[in-house]
């Protein structure tokens, strides 16, 4: 059960990072931390109950890798356009 406790702690750290950080890259890293906490939870439940949670965790990792590529591409494009990755600057809708 220490897997689930560690997973909950990592998820709480990720939520804290999303709520308190102001740069888009750190918010993005916090979201990735939350996804990894969910993966750890899947594997922890699989180990405790003899299920195949590893397969689901591998699928989540594959989707997260694609998300990282798209997300970092968007952050780089925003930085080139606005010269900043501050989340507060991104809330303004301009043409």
Swiss-Prot record:
Key words of the record: Cell inner membrane, Cell membrane, Membrane, NAD, Quinone, Translocase, Transmembrane, Transmembrane helix, Transport
Any one GO cellular component localisation term in the record: NADH dehydrogenase complex
InterPro entries assigned to the protein according to its UniProt record, in alphabetical order: NADH_UbQ_OxRdtase_chain4L/K, NUOK/Mnh_C1-like
Biological role stated in the UniProt entry: NDH-1 shuttles electrons from NADH, via FMN and iron-sulfur (Fe-S) centers, to quinones in the respiratory chain. The immediate electron acceptor for the enzyme in this species is menaquinone. Couples the redox reaction to proton translocation (for every two electrons transferred, four hydrogen ions are translocated across the cytoplasmic membrane), and thus conserves the redox energy in a proton gradient required for the synthesis of ATP.
Membrane topology value: Multi-pass membrane protein
Enzyme Commission designation: 7.1.1.-
Location within or outside the cell: Cell inner membrane
Family the UniProt entry places it in: Belongs to the complex I subunit 4L family.
Location, primary (coarse class): membrane
Single GO biological process annotation from the record: ATP synthesis coupled electron transport
Assembly notes: NDH-1 is composed of 15 different subunits, Nqo1 to Nqo15. The complex has a L-shaped structure, with the hydrophobic arm (subunits Nqo7, Nqo8 and Nqo10 to Nqo14) embedded in the membrane and the hydrophilic peripheral arm (subunits Nqo1 to Nqo6, Nqo9 and Nqo15) protruding into the bacterial cytoplasm. The hydrophilic domain contains all the redox centers.
Protein name in UniProt: NADH-quinone oxidoreductase subunit 11
Organism (species): Thermus thermophilus (strain ATCC 27634 / DSM 579 / HB8)
